Amino acid sequence: DLLDDYVNTQGASLLTLSRKKLAGRSVEDCAAKCEEEAQDCYHGNGQSYRGTSSTTVTGRKCQSWSSMIPHRHQKTPESYPNAGLTMNYCRNPDADKSPWCYTTDPRVRWEFCNLKKCSEDSE
């Protein structure tokens, strides 16, 4: 079941195992947020994407957002506390066209990630 990895709390909110609180107007709203978080696709420009993909369109591995090696940058978890800059997961902290990451390849600073748009967003 989708909600097995979530902890039930008071009212219409859930906590993920990492203790991230997901608030909602109803249990159904919370379940929808949980489902969106677990998807390997993104909605809109992907600013809300919180999946665990960490590979770029060319197959490069993503650099951790808290690391400055090999690329120094300003997009840190401290600078963007609500952007979900966890581990080396693909994210879109600056409202680009889709989720992206800095790469571990010293010759390639960043790339968009190998993610699809969710089907209901397709044109």
From Swiss-Prot:
Keyword terms, alphabetized: Blood coagulation, Disulfide bond, Fibrinolysis, Hemostasis, Hydrolase, Kringle, Protease, Secreted, Serine protease, Tissue remodeling, Zymogen
Q: Which residues cross the membrane?
A: none
Its UniProt domain note says:
Kringle domains mediate interaction with CSPG4.
Primary localization class, coarse: secreted
Family, similarity comment: Belongs to the peptidase S1 family. Plasminogen subfamily.
Question: Pfam families in the record, alphabetically?
Answer: Kringle
Which residue numbers delimit the Kringle domain?
Answer: 40-118
Q: Which GO terms describe its cellular component?
A: extracellular space
Annotated gene: PLG
Under which name does UniProt file this protein? Plasminogen
Q: How does it assemble?
A: Interacts with CSPG4 and AMOT. Interacts (via the Kringle domains) with HRG; the interaction tethers PLG to the cell surface and enhances its activation. Interacts (via Kringle 4 domain) with ADA; the interaction stimulates PLG activation when in complex with DPP4. Angiostatin: Interacts with ATP5F1A; the interaction inhibits most of the angiogenic effects of angiostatin.
Reactions this protein catalyses: Preferential cleavage: Lys-|-Xaa > Arg-|-Xaa, higher selectivity than trypsin. Converts fibrin into soluble products
Which GO molecular function terms does the record list?
serine-type endopeptidase activity; signaling receptor binding
Regulation acting on activity, per entry: Converted into plasmin by plasminogen activators, both plasminogen and its activator being bound to fibrin. Cannot be activated with streptokinase.
Q: Which organism is it from?
A: Capra hircus (Goat)
UniProt entry tagged with the keyword Acetylation = no
Described by its record, this protein's role is as follows: Plasmin dissolves the fibrin of blood clots and acts as a proteolytic factor in a variety of other processes including embryonic development, tissue remodeling, tumor invasion, and inflammation. In ovulation, weakens the walls of the Graafian follicle. It activates the urokinase-type plasminogen activator, collagenases and several complement zymogens, such as C1, C4 and C5. Cleavage of fibronectin and laminin leads to cell detachment and apoptosis. Also cleaves fibrin, thrombospondin and von Willebrand factor. Its role in tissue remodeling and tumor invasion may be modulated by CSPG4.
